[in-house]
């Protein structure tokens, strides 16, 4: 895990791929978002929905973590360019303690390198190599 639950974590960004290939695995992804929020217990979880651009974001506070799965509203459905998230985080001047990427790993070639610790949760793709940080394999079955 990116953080131990006893650490003061500040805000955590979860960057969720919403490209067309992700739709069928949203239940798995939503479960991972809920587990991350509840287990890490950061000061806030900012979910950024992205495909070839950032399509939306949602900010959740600790009192919402136990129902976060039902509150998630993904938007997008186009290509897959993680660099748009990096640029978005910089333009908004967000200072997260870490970024968790949730994706199937079929990216456009841009790297998605952030200036904070990164964890890549990759669904149903054993061949993906993260551009930075650690990779966790997630299986939808």
Residue ranges of each PLM-predicted region?
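Glycine-centered flexibility sites
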Residues: 20, 78-79, 105, 133
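Short, surface-exposed, polar/charged, turn-prone segments marking secondary-structure boundaries
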Residues: 41-44, 74-78, 127-130
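Short, small-residue-biased leader/transition segments that mark boundaries at the very start
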Residues: 1-2
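VWA/integrin I-like adhesion module and closely mimicked acidic/polar interface patches used
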Residues: 106-141
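Von Willebrand factor
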Residues: 6-64, 72, 84-103, 107, ...
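Acidic, Ser/Thr-rich peripheral helices and adjacent loops at domain boundaries
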Residues: 58-82, 136-141
